[in-house]
Amino acid sequence: MRLPAPQKQAIVGTARPLKAIAATPQFIEAAAAGVVSYGLMAFLMTAAPMAMVGCGHSVGEAALGIQWHVLAMFGPSFFTGRLIGRFGQRKITALGLVMIAASGLLALMGEGLSEFWGSLILLGVGWNFGFIGATAMLTACYTPAERTKVQALNDFLVFGTVAIASFGSGQLLHSVGWSGINIGMQPLVVIVLAIMAWQARKIKS
């Protein structure tokens, strides 16, 4: 079977310098939302099984919690696009961030299976809404001529943060504990929500 050769699409327009694009409020808002959504999800998902075992739960129970978490991460994708189309990118992204913060608050309520599993499920859905919404917001930051380099910068920021979060989660869990992690994440979410609220107000005015 022979596949047709890919056709090159003409890119019209002059691309702005990447530094100029990265300094725009639109890019800062979208990148911050994506970095915090994905970074906190990776951090907590990595730390949660260790915390569960440390609290006396079995490895099997920790694994089941991660399975529910992964299902919550990708299950909503069947309708996330429709929600974004109906309510808007910013609102769904903000909802995802609120759910991530709520997952941390639920984790602070106890060390039982219901708190761990419920927190992981909330975290998964929050990541879905937050990251997909932030990715959709990013598309408004660039022209076709700028798309490749802007997406590359955003991916570098997001997945660089994910790598650091994944490698550092165990050490931080050992240093401050499960409760300390879930308390410490809250200001990050608040900062991004404040950026988004400021940008939304600026657009309306």
Spans of features found by a protein language model:
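Pair of pore-lining "gating" transmembrane helices in MFS-fold secondary transporters
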Residues: 23-41, 121
